[in-house]
């Protein structure tokens, strides 16, 4: 029995692969190029239980056909993590919306064609972006939970890259639930979505620390490189540690109770002030070199904006998430080691 992880070289996916291998699963991953595939198998020590396939372009509806033609009878679990996540785009529809939706439709059609009898569980890496209404995130009277959906339309979400990304996650997840509804008679798999908020935490491998990191971790990285007089970005939201997101993907297919559920993975709220407080307190090398802001004032973050209620998800998952201090400490220390500052 194998677990297939699409986009296995991604930030979250590498941690998923690590946990799967530690739990002795046989893992097949995909990446966009042979070079990325080889780099990842090497990073995992050429583990005999881990192999890679190349899927160059997930926006093509038959992109995953060859994977399931080759391994379909052996794959019981599919974790679809591959999706575009970048705000530096020129065409929202071409660069974000179509690849995200086609990636989901394509992989599910490939399962239907070549692994309808063998795949039992599918876990989709969605996002809190598919849940909340960006236009109303500052409305204190609102609560978003597992039943909530981003109200964006295909047209309205193309107003800017951030809205387009949020829309891409909504339409990709909707496509998955709709596919299952329409194909109940021809596939046996059950579906679960994992909807993380801002994902912080260390890279799986130190070698993957770069000058610029993936979008969420770059928020921490950029704070660490501000000057004391720089303005602190005004940002708040929910946070989760990447290692907890990875674990949530495993629990999502290991438990029967998670079938048909959307799992919002968020530990608590944060502001950039909270992150700065931790950086200044725990890293002497940063103290005096980055802004101080108003220490402790981040505590007001629970009064900011709409409420995120994920009590149901936390209960279903049944494990304790890491707190912000541990997450930021591990993220920052890895970056500082890479830079030779600690």
Swiss-Prot record:
Give the PANTHER family listed for this entry: NAD DEPENDENT EPIMERASE/DEHYDRATASE (PTHR10366), NADPH-DEPENDENT METHYLGLYOXAL REDUCTASE GRE2 (PTHR10366:SF844)
Q: Which GO cellular component terms, listed alphabetically, does the Swiss-Prot or TrEMBL entry include?
A: cytoplasm; nucleus
| Class of enzymatic activity (EC top level) | oxidoreductase
Recorded GO molecular functions are: 3-methylbutanal reductase (NADPH) activity; 3-methylbutanal reductase [NAD(P)H] activity; methylglyoxal reductase (NADPH) activity; oxidoreductase activity, acting on the CH-OH group of donors, NAD or NADP as acceptor
Q: What does this protein do?
A: Catalyzes the irreversible reduction of the cytotoxic compound methylglyoxal (MG, 2-oxopropanal) to (S)-lactaldehyde as an alternative to detoxification of MG by glyoxalase I GLO1. MG is synthesized via a bypath of glycolysis from dihydroxyacetone phosphate and is believed to play a role in cell cycle regulation and stress adaptation. Also catalyzes the reduction of 3-methylbutanal to 3-methylbutanol. Acts as a suppressor of 3-methylbutanol-induced filamentation by modulating the levels of 3-methylbutanal, the signal to which cells respond by filamentation.
Family designation: Belongs to the NAD(P)-dependent epimerase/dehydratase family. Dihydroflavonol-4-reductase subfamily.
EC number(s) stated in the UniProt entry for this protein: 1.1.1.283, 1.1.1.265
Protein name, per record: NADPH-dependent methylglyoxal reductase GRE2
Where mainly located?
cytoplasm
| Locations listed in the record | Cytoplasm; Nucleus
């Amino acid at each position: 029995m194998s677990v297939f992880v699409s986009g296995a070289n991604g930030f979250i996916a590498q941690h998923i692969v690590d946990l799967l291998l530690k739990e002795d699963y046989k893992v097949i991953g995909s990446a966009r190029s042979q070079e990325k595939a080889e780099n990842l198998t090497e990073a995992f020590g050429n583990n005999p239980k881990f192999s890679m396939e190349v899927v160059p372009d997930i926006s093509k509806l038959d992109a995953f056909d060859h994977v399931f033609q080759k391994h379909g009878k052996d794959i019981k679990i599919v974790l679809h993590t591959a999706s575009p996540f970048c705000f530096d785009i020129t065409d929202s529809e071409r660069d974000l919306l179509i690849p995200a939706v086609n990636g989901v439709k394509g992989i599910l059609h490939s399962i239907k064609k070549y692994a309808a009898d063998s795949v039992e569980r599918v876990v989709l890496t969605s996002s809190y972006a598919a849940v909340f209404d960006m236009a109303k995130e500052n409305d204190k009277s609102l609560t978003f939970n597992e039943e909530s959906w981003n109200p964006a339309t295909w047209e309205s979400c193309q107003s800017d890259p951030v809205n387009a990304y949020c829309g891409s996650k909504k339409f990709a997840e909707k496509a998955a639930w709709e596919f299952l509804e329409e194909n109940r008679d021809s596939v046996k798999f059950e579906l679960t979505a994992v909807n993380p908020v801002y994902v912080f935490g260390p890279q799986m491998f130190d070698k993957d620390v770069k000058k610029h990191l993936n979008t969420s971790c770059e928020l921490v990285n950029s704070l660490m490189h501000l000057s004391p007089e720089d303005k602190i970005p005004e940002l708040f939201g929910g946070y989760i540690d990447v290692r907890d997101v990875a674990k949530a993907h495993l629990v999502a297919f290991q438990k029967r109770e998670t079938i048909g559920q959307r799992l919002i993975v968020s530990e608590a709220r944060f502001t950039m002030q909270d992150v700065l407080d931790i950086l200044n307190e725990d890293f002497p090398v940063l103290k005096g070199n980055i802004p101080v802001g108003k220490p402790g004032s981040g505590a007001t973050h629970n009064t900011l904006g709409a409420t995120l209620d994920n009590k149901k998800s936390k209960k279903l998952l049944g494990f304790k998430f890491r707190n912000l201090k541990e997450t930021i400490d591990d993220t920052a220390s890895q970056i500082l080691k890479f830079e030779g500052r600690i």
